[in-house]
Amino acid sequence: MFYNVVKEYPDIIVDYSVSRFEKFGSAVTLVAQIEFTDHSVRYIKDYLFVDGTRKYSYHWQDAYGQLRARWDNSPHHKHIVTFPHHKHESGKTSPSHERNLRDILEVIRQSL
């Protein structure tokens, strides 16, 4: 799935790599990196567990290593209406409906 989605965005993606992919039954681990046309980078950690639960972090930083945005579902920020899903941006945490690679690539496409 990762490769199929990445191929849909040749206008914004210049390079990508998968540093870890493991599948054990229905459990999946994906650790990857995507470089964009402005040299910003997105670091991906996505874990699907056997019980169907998922843990993810999509960290996007500029070419100088400064955070542009991070989407994750770490179970803190209980006050956010989309808890546990949220977005870190400009020093603030906000609700997030983007929860997968394609949704977040669309946000990045609009920003580039």
Give each language-model segment a name.
Residues 90-112:
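Well-ordered alpha/beta subsegment
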Residues 54-80:
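Mid-chain, well-packed structural core segment of small domains
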Residues 78-92:
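Short helix/strand-capping connector loops at secondary-structure junctions
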Residues 10, 75, 109-112:
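Generic secondary-structure transition motif, activating predominantly at the C-termini of alpha-helices
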Residues 43-47, 68-74, 97:
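Short amphipathic beta-strand/extended segments with alternating polar/hydrophobic composition
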